[in-house]
Amino acid sequence: MHPYMRRSPNLVVLSGPSGVGKDAMLNRMRLDGASVHFTVTATTRQIRVNEREGIDYIFLSQEKFAEKRDRNDFLECALVYGNWYGVPKRQVTDAFDRGLDVLVKIDVQGAATIKRLAPQAVLVFVAPPSIHELERRLRWRLTESEESLALRTETARREMEHLPAFDYVIVNDALEEAVRQLVCIVAAERCRIPPRVVRL
């Protein structure tokens, strides 16, 4: 078999401002039965209404998270808006062993860290149609104070400046179309010549 025919699993990193719709996109892909592994991020923040332990996030105490961080159990971890978030390394390596592509949802800072650790990772930025629309979505969530809303909006403006570091951008103006584009990116990367080879 030609070396290019031996496909290695891809590490696809989905990033973008808070409230842009990353979770909605991944949930739709799950419902549609996408043949990828969706990592579940560990966090120290409080669980929100309708979130499920082990499905939306792995909720840990500060102490437990620190233990795992000290053992180097995370592919990447960072303090975001006062809470720790980390991608469990074991989830990624186990999925790779099964030949599955891996989708990681992470903040822009974390995406840059993963790209340094795994230069062959595929970085996808999800952008809002406008900052005004992003602010509207954050207000609709009813989880943010005015102070938090202002901070997240300003952070989003700064994060948009990192777009050139990404491989793809999806403007999430309509959920179905945004999901279709993400599915197409994953499919296209599977056909890439030469294939990406991710080493962790």
Label each residue range with its predicted role.
Residues 15-17:
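P-loop (Walker A) phosphate-binding loop of NTP-binding proteins
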Residues 102-107, 116-141:
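Conserved phosphate-donor/acceptor-positioning beta-strand/loop module used by diverse small-molecule
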